[in-house]
């Protein structure tokens, strides 16, 4: 992969990119894995607030787990090409269906190596947070993963 990427936390400055990223998935009828409640949250500021709630162990909703949301930005044009969410624990649902890491690449940016690069960054973050074993799940129909 020749593109330079940034793996970082989302900010309010990403609002236009958030809207574009979300719409690309809706238009493609594609799953928004690793984006938290993006599908049901059209407002980027609301999405950021929800991510902040889940990032703080004191405010995570009952039955949910602490998580950290990341975006993958292509440096050359500032475009968000992917998103990845790290869950710092597993509940019953995540143990069977979601795992510690969920991620997605914008439909028109797939097959460029972005997912592999993001996953490596996500695993580094997991190690930095003390996770020694990480569960990643995938549907059988997801040939790229």
Language-model features: locations:
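GNAT-family acyltransferases
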Residues: 2-100
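Conserved acetyl-CoA-binding loop-helix of GNAT-fold acetyltransferases
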Residues: 102-105, 111-128
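Short aromatic/hydrophobic contact patches that present stacked aromatics
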Residues: 6, 102, 135-137
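Conserved beta-strand-loop-alpha-helix junction that forms the acyl-donor binding cleft
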Residues: 110, 136-145
